From Swiss-Prot:
Protein name, per record: Calcium-dependent protein kinase 34
Membrane topology of the entry: Lipid-anchor
Segments crossing the lipid bilayer: none
Basic and acidic residues compositional bias, start-end: 7-20
Family: Belongs to the protein kinase superfamily. Ser/Thr protein kinase family. CDPK subfamily.
Sequence segments annotated as region (Disordered): 1-60
Alphabetized PROSITE patterns for the sequence: EF_HAND_1 (PS00018), EF_HAND_2 (PS50222), PROTEIN_KINASE_ATP (PS00107), PROTEIN_KINASE_DOM (PS50011), PROTEIN_KINASE_ST (PS00108)
Cross-referenced Gene3D superfamilies: EF-hand, Phosphorylase Kinase, domain 1, Transferase(Phosphotransferase) domain 1
UniProt catalytic activity: L-seryl-[protein] + ATP = O-phospho-L-seryl-[protein] + ADP + H(+); L-threonyl-[protein] + ATP = O-phospho-L-threonyl-[protein] + ADP + H(+)
Lipidation (N-myristoyl glycine): G2
Species of provenance: Arabidopsis thaliana
Broadest EC class assigned to this enzyme: transferase
Length: 523
């Protein structure tokens, strides 16, 4: 899709990013809201002169310093340096990772950066995944602006506490597996899961946990096999070493993390990397040394099932979440959470047609990197390559993602996404229905959508203009246009101005920075 709204925003991230606040090197981040984040006043964004196209992000170059003030260095890694940065418009603080383009020495390096941007855009909005705020490219560097994880690494917090219970370990694991269940249901394999890639949003006792560093992550389709050996030695699954693997490799890595959480040492250890790999391939896990004799049988059962050398016999993320040990404190659900795409479809169903048309316009303005993940999901569901998804294809596609729905629920979702009511979901309808609602926080997207309706550039959307737009998209459902206008028209002048339009678009959307996220407690 085109770049008509792409405002030098999107983003990218890279392998081995510097770790904020604890000197490490992962795609650190998580927005430490220095002030409460309320929506800024709705006013059309100023027109900006576009620069030349950047070779890495493939869109106009832009100076990150026009929107952010860069501060102290937070960390340094192989590919980049991370600085604290402050958004000029709001005063909010973020992390800005700068990648020198001279370090991207070949086509593969550039593709890795682009893919990471696409994946982070695809996952942005999930509560326990670091959020990408934007990416900028100038002559010398690519700059990634993301949430600031000021709380440091998860394991550092555990070590500082000095002790924790199996119940606390189960709570941590539940959050980590829920994150990966979301990734897998959205067609992403992380491929580099390790303790260093889980950061805390803040230094608060109950700070949310954030998954970071998607530099090695890939999009995948069910049944797809990967062959390249990537990851960190202690956490690599045996099938990765054998160059034939899929999403099951992530579960192995989390199983290694659980083993370490329970006993303090990795299950496969040696003096050299090759020695570690040989130990992994042998598959022998020690459950006899201290403290394993006093660890509960249920915990050991889960570790064994996550570290099964046969990926076909290994538990899936959904099965891990249903294991008795993880559910012991009663907080874990009986079934995995609905996958993110299904939740978005449900939300889309509740929107009025005016808002749905606006979302179609915004979907057409998103950059390729913002919708790449959804594009792949659409292609995966469109099994006959017709360019549309039928009811049966939607049913099968949701089932492959691990979502169990009744026939009625599938039909309801079909009706929600099929905006023009022709019995199938086309590409534009799918993107509009499933793109994350945080796209509505971007002023340039909202303004472009408003301009689409405001044909005469009067600054208002009239009854005639709204009727024309609904007809254009085949979405005039018989409701009186004046009734729709009256729902949105705050000052009762019979037309809709930009501020009223923005209020309608944001009404009923989830808070992009909810205070109540999944919380951790170390007891």
């Amino acid at each position: 899709m085109g770049n008509c709204c792409s405002h030098g925003r999107d983003s990218d991230d890279n392998k081995e990013e510097p770790r904020p606040e604890n000197g490490g090197g992962g795609v650190g981040a998580a927005e430490a809201s220095v002030r409460a984040s309320k929506h800024p006043p709705a006013s059309p964004p100023p027109a900006t002169k576009q620069g030349p196209i950047g070779p890495v992000l493939g869109r106009p170059m832009e100076d990150v310093k026009s929107s952010y003030t860069l501060g102290k260095e937070l960390g340094r890694g192989q590919f980049g340096v991370t600085h604290l940065c402050t958004q000029k418009a709001t005063g909010l603080q973020f992390a800005c990772k700068t990648i020198a383009k001279r370090k991207l020495v070949n086509k593969e390096d550039i593709e890795d950066v682009r893919r990471e941007v696409q994946i982070m855009h695809h996952l942005t909005g999930q509560p326990n995944i670091v959020e990408l705020k934007g990416a900028y490219e100038d002559k010398h560097s690519v700059h990634l602006v993301m949430e600031l994880c000021a709380g440091g690494e998860l394991f550092d917090r555990i070590i500082a506490k000095g002790h924790y219970s199996e119940r606390a370990a189960a709570s941590l694991l539940r959050t980590i597996v829920q994150i990966i269940h979301t990734c897998h249901s959205m067609g992403v394999i992380h491929r580099d899961l390790k303790p260093e890639n889980f950061l805390l949003l803040s230094k608060d006792e109950n700070s949310p946990l954030k998954a970071t560093d998607f530099g090695l992550s890939v999009f995948y389709k069910p049944g797809e096999v990967f062959k390249d050996i990537v990851g960190s030695a202690y956490y690599i699954a045996p099938e990765v070493l054998r160059r034939k693997y899929g999403p099951e490799a992530d579960i192995w890595s989390i199983g290694v993390m659980l083993y370490i959480l329970l006993c303090g040492v990795p299950p496969f250890w040696a003096e050299s990397e090759n020695g570690i790999f040989n130990a992994i391939l042998s598959g022998q896990v020690d459950f006899s040394s201290d403290p394993w004799p006093v660890i509960s049988p249920q915990a050991k059962d889960l570790v064994r099932k996550m570290l099964n050398s046969d990926p076909k016999q290994r538990l899936t993320a959904a099965q891990v979440l249903n294991h008795p040990w993880i559910k012991e404190d009663g907080e874990a659900p009986d079934v995995p959470l609905d996958n993110a795409v299904m939740s978005r479809l449900k939300q889309f169903k509740a929107m009025n047609n005016f808002k749905k048309v606006a979302l179609r316009v915004i979907a057409g303005c998103l950059s390729e990197e913002e919708i790449m993940g959804l594009k792949e999901m659409f292609k995966g569901m469109d099994t006959d390559n017709s360019g549309t998804i039928t009811l049966e294809e939607l049913r099968q596609g949701l089932a492959k993602q691990g979502t169990r729905l009744s026939e009625y629920e599938v039909q309801q979702l079909m009706e929600a996404a099929d905006a023009d009511g022709n019995g199938t979901i086309d590409y534009g309808e799918f993107i509009a229905a499933t793109m994350h609602i945080n796209r509505l926080d971007r002023e340039e997207h909202l303004y472009s959508a408003f301009q689409h309706f405001d044909k005469d550039n009067s600054g208002y959307i009239t009854t005639e203009e709204l009727e024309q737009a609904l007809r254009e998209f085949g979405m005039n459902d018989g409701r009186d246009i004046k009734e729709i206008i009256s729902e949105v028209d705050g000052d009762n002048d019979g037309r809709i101005n930009y501020e009223e339009f923005v209020a309608m678009m944001r009404k009923g959307n989830p808070d992009p920075n909810p205070k109540k996220r999944r919380e951790l407690s170390f007891k």
